[in-house]
Amino acid sequence: MSRTILFQGDSITDCGRARIEITDPAYLRSGLGLGYPYLIAARLLCDRGEDFNFYNFGISGNRVVDLYARWKADCINLRPDILSILIGVNDTWHEKARQNGVEVPRYEQFYRMLLDWTLKELPEIKLVLLEPFVFPFSAVGGDWIEESDQRREVVAGIAKDYGAVFVPLQSILNNALKVAPQEHWLADGVHPMPAGHQLIADAWIKAAAPLLN
C-alpha cells in the first residue's frame, strides 16, 4: 500500500507549483513545483517505484500562523503518513518589511499547536522538521541573523520533544560554502537556487531514510 508524503511550508516549498487538484492526472508532473519536493519525489519514485504518493501544499508568503489557519483542509483532511514542514523565514521577513511577522515565542507556540493538533488526529504520522535558513546578503539584513538563529533553536527543540526527524539545513548550507559561494546556493539569501534545492532534497532523503522503509 502506498504511503503519502505531504510537504508544507512557504515559497521555498511552493516553488511555482500548479494549483491543481491532487486527483488531476497532471498533479505529479505539475503540482509538486520545481523545488526540493519535486526532487525528493523524483528520487524516491525512481528508487522505490510506486511506494509513495506526494503532495505539496506549500504556499508562498506563509507564516506559521497561516499554516495553522489552513491546517484542517491542507493537512488533517489529507491524512498523510509522513509530514514535512519548513516554515519560519516569513515570520521574520514580514516583520522586517511591514511589521506583520510572528515573534519567536508565538512562532514556537503555533508550531507546537500545529503538531499537537496533527498528532491528536493522526497519531501514527511521522514528522520531518526542517530548520529555516538564511544567508546574510540581498534580501536578508544583518538584523535577521539573531532572530533566525532563535527560530532554528526552536525547531530543533520541537523536533526533539516530538520525536521528529530534524534536518539542520543552516549547517548543511554553511558547509556548502566550502564548495561554492552563497549566491550559488541561495538567490537572495532566502530562496534556493537549483543547487540549493538539490542540497535540501539530498539532506531530507538522508535524514528521513528510517521513515521510508
Q: What kind of region is each of these model predictions?
A:
Residues 39-53, 66-213:
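Alpha-helical cap/lid subdomain in secreted, periplasmic
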Residues 59-64:
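Functional beta-strand-loop-alpha-helix junction segments that form "active/interaction loops"
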Residues 1-57, 72-79:
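Serine-esterase "nucleophile elbow" of acetyl-processing enzymes
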